[in-house]
Amino acid sequence: MALDAAKKREIIARYQKHENDTGSPEVQIAILTERINHLTEHLQVHHKDHHSRRGLLKMVGQRRGLLNYLRENDVERYRQIVESLGLRR
C-alpha cells in the first residue's frame, strides 16, 4: 500500500519546513496519515485482510509516537499539524 512518487512529493512539498526537508515530524505524520487513509479504504472492502490490518495498526502507533514527540517538544507545531490533517485529538 505504498504511495506513488508524485503523491508523496506533493505531501512533502506541502508540509516541509525548508527545501530539503523530508524527515521532519510534520512530513512523516502527513505521509503516514495518507498511507493510513489509503489502507483504511482497502480494509473496508477487504475486511478479512488481517495482514494489512496489522500493518495499519503499526502505522497508527508510529504516527501516535510522532504526534506525542511533537506535542512534548513544540505544542504550536503539534496543533497546526493536527488541524491541517483533521486528526482527532
From Swiss-Prot:
Record InterPro entries: Ribosomal_uS15, Ribosomal_uS15_bac-type, uS15_NS1_RNA-bd_sf
Domain of life: Bacteria
Signal peptide: none
Any one of the GO CC terms: cytosolic small ribosomal subunit
RNA-binding as UniProt keyword: yes
Family from the record: Belongs to the universal ribosomal protein uS15 family.
Function noted in UniProt: One of the primary rRNA binding proteins, it binds directly to 16S rRNA where it helps nucleate assembly of the platform of the 30S subunit by binding and bridging several RNA helices of the 16S rRNA.
HAMAP family noted in UniProt: Ribosomal_uS15_B
Name by which UniProt lists this protein: Small ribosomal subunit protein uS15
Organism: Moorella thermoacetica (strain ATCC 39073 / JCM 9320)
